[in-house]
């Protein structure tokens, strides 16, 4: 059973009850689970994750997400705000806006992000990107701490960083995976940023939010990586001086 087949579970269970093989691994282009109120089995009553997107369109060569979660689609902002409001009323004080690539969030009425170019004039005019959503969440819930993860360097915008600096309740922390400090390896990974572009983004973040914490994801030993490529990664880490990272 695939992750988007939950609505078909009664039928699948019925097939199993009748000694039939039950399979449904079809990935939806519209399902965002926005109409489901999560049951938080392991909760501390303080912090919670709130999903804002599903899937991914980036097709990094080391990642299976596009094949297991499907095309990127964004959740209705009203549904997101309702879930956060429910958490606030239950006493939660911190939420993390969650997505494979939160900065790529784009709501224009529903559907995959790749189809946005086909949207009507009104849909495009009324669309919301991640900076709009982040601003809405921080403004509507000033007593809650707001975090978000994960950001992709190719989609992280100055607007998002400026919204962070505008609201005291948005934590000054960005998880910004680079994966490698070598342009040659980044190309093999099908990453859509270069070393220079990444470092320029880091510079911009620290100009706007000098005390911003920054963490990373890094892959070493990627197929074809040379000692020179590895040294490029080490030099990038030395230049950025991350607060912590996943390797």
Question: Can you say where each PLM-predicted feature lies in the sequence?
Answer:
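OB-fold and OB-like beta-barrel modules that bind single-stranded nucleic acids
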Residues: 9, 174-176, 245
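Generic structural signal for secondary-structure transition and capping sites
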Residues: 18-21, 142, 169, 242
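Proteins enriched for Cys/Gly/acidic motifs involved in redox and nucleic-acid/cofactor modification
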Residues: 1-105, 129, 159, 196-207, ...
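Conserved SAM/AdoMet-binding glycine-rich loop
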Residues: 89-227
């Amino acid at each position: 059973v695939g992750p988007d087949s939950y609505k078909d579970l009664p039928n699948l269970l019925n097939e199993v009850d009748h000694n039939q093989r039950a399979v449904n691994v079809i990935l939806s282009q519209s399902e965002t689970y926005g109409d489901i109120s999560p049951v938080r089995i392991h909760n501390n009553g303080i912090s919670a994750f709130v999903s804002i997107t599903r899937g991914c369109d980036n097709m990094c060569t080391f990642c299976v997400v596009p094949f297991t979660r499907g095309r990127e689609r964004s959740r209705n902002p009203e549904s997101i705000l309702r879930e956060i409001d429910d958490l606030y009323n239950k006493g939660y004080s911190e939420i993390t806006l969650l997505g494979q690539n939160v900065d790529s969030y784009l709501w224009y009425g529903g559907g995959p992000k790749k189809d946005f170019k086909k949207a009507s004039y009104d849909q495009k005019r009324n669309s919301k990107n991640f900076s709009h959503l982040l601003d809405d969440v921080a403004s509507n819930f000033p007593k809650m701490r707001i975090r978000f993860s994960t950001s992709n360097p190719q989609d992280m915008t100055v607007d998002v960083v400026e919204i962070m600096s505008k609201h005291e309740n948005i934590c000054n922390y960005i998880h910004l995976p680079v994966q490698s400090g070598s342009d040659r390896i980044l190309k093999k990974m099908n990453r859509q940023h270069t070393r220079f572009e990444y470092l320029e983004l880091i510079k911009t973040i620290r100009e706007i939010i000098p005390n911003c914490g920054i963490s990373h994801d890094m892959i070493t030993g990627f197929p074809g990586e040379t000692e020179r490529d590895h040294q490029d990664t080490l030099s990038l880490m030395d230049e950025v001086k991350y607060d912590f990272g996943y390797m």
